[in-house]
Every structure is written in structure tokens, then in C-alpha cells.
Amino acid sequence: NKRNYQKELEKLIDQAQKDNKIPSLFLHSCCAPCSSYVLEYLSKYFNITVFYYNPNIYPEEEYRKRVHEITRLVNSMESEHPVKLIEGHYDPQEFFRMAKGLEDVPEGGERCFKCYRLRMEEAAKLAEEGGYDYFTLFLYTSDAAD
């Protein structure tokens, strides 16, 4: 019995519209390309805060390029409701500590799941502290994340 998350989202949206409410959404983003459609779609129904926290991106020059792109996307996109960006702290040592002993694990294995957890926990903590109505993430949109 698989859950249909799209149908669940549609029910949330329908209820918010019936209540004449624009809920707040804290959304972790892995990168700008994966974020573009998601933001375009969800900004019709939510006030969105995009959280860019990805200590797994190395070297810092690559990380900065990605921050620039997500910033450019958020600042240039047209949206029905507000979309703002928060950049998390960048400390690749966090990722290296988490991945210690897993360096030879193939892509898509335990190291990836621990990295997902690292980012999800940070995002969930900030979403709760910020009092957002909803929290979500999208780390799996790209073929590279299979």
C-alpha cells in the first residue's frame, strides 16, 4: 500500500484554500536545477523559505557556484507568493566526519543516506524553530541521485 504524496499535497492545498490561508513552507534545496519546477509549482500555494544547506559539496569554489545559482533562481523567478532564501552554514568537515569509514561505499549507498539524514535533521530543526506550517525537501529529482 504505497502512499501517493501528490494526492496528499493536493488535499493540503485544497484545505488551505478553503480556509483562505497561505501556509508557510520550509524547503531544503539540494541545487537550483532541481529546485526550479518545485518552486514554480509550490509558490502558487505556499509562502516558501528555501534552505540551502549542503556541506557535502566540495571544494568551496563549487559550493559558492551552487549558492550563486540558487540565489539567482530565487531572486529572478516570478512567484505568486513570497519565496526567500536562507543559506545554512558551510562546513565540509561536518560531511567528512559523517562519511569517515564510508569513503569506498558506492554512490547511492550508506554514505548517501547518512548525508541525506545530516541535511534533513538540520533543516527539520530550523523549520521547527521558525514555526513553519510545513517542512519538506527534495533530494531525489536528479538522475544523479538514483
Q: Which residues does each predicted region cover?
A:
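Non-catalytic terminal extensions that flank enzyme cores
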Residues: 1-27
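A conserved beta-strand->alpha-helix junction
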Residues: 78-97
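Conserved small/polar residues in nucleotide/adenosyl-binding loops
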Residues: 140-146
